[in-house]
């Protein structure tokens, strides 16, 4: 009995191994990718041939075209010691000096023709101020000042500066009468004077001498 069971067990074990081996072969055949054996590289054959140029046809010889390079511009330099002096042509520049000199002379001529206002004499009375004109005419004379004094002084001298438009831009008393009311009143009167305009752009000076008549 023991011998029969041992043989049966041995057959069973062998059948199991055979089945496992068969299953493994089947698995490899069905599921694993087919791996092709490496192929041997075939040698490449290279053939070198010499290509000959076709023979040239007889004809006229072609001329070579040569491009001319731009000539370099020569710059003349000042001659140094020991060098041969070279004449340098300078361009004549148009000078504006003659025109400027002409304009300056014209302005100076106009200034000489237009004299300063110079000395002006004026006589002050109770009703009016009579002005004896100098070299420049008056176009406006304000009303005469009114003084509340018992006696008029001898004279008052006022220096004036007049612009080209004819307005008195500055006035100062150079000789006072001694009466403040008279001096200040004549100064205000003088600043309101207006002379004729001139074309020359300059300020003219003059002196007005006021005297009084009763």
Swiss-Prot record:
Residues 54-67 have a biased composition (Basic residues). InterPro entries: TonB/TolA_C. Keywords: Membrane, Transmembrane, Transmembrane helix. Residues 53-74 are annotated as: Disordered. One of its GO terms (cellular component) is membrane. The chain crosses the membrane at residues 9-31. It is a single-pass membrane protein. The keyword Kinase does not apply. It is found in: Membrane. NCBIfam families: tonB_Cterm (TIGR01352). This is Uncharacterized protein aq_1982. It comes from Aquifex aeolicus (strain VF5).
């Amino acid at each position: 009995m023991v011998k029969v069971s041992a043989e049966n067990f041995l057959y069973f074990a062998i059948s199991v191994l055979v089945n496992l081996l068969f299953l493994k072969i089947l698995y490899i055949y069905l599921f694993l990718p087919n791996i092709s054996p490496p192929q041997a590289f075939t040698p490449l054959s290279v053939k070198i041939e010499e290509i000959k140029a076709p023979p040239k046809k007889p004809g006229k010889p072609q001329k070579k075209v040569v491009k001319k390079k731009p000539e370099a511009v020569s710059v003349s330099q000042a001659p140094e010691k020991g060098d041969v002096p070279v004449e340098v042509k300078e361009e004549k520049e148009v000078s504006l000096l003659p025109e400027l000199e002409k304009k300056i002379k014209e302005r100076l001529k106009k200034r000489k023709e237009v004299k300063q206002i110079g000395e002006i004499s004026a006589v002050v009375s109770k009703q009016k101020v009579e002005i004896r004109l100098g070299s420049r005419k008056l176009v406006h004379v304000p009303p005469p000042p009114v003084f509340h004094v018992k006696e008029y002084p001898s004279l008052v001298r006022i220096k004036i500066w007049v612009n080209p438009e004819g307005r008195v831009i500055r006035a100062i008393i150079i000789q006072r009468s001694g009466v403040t009311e008279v001096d200040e009143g004549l100064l205000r009167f003088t600043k309101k004077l207006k002379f004729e305009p001139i074309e020359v752009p300059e300020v003219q000076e003059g002196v007005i001498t006021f005297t009084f008549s009763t």
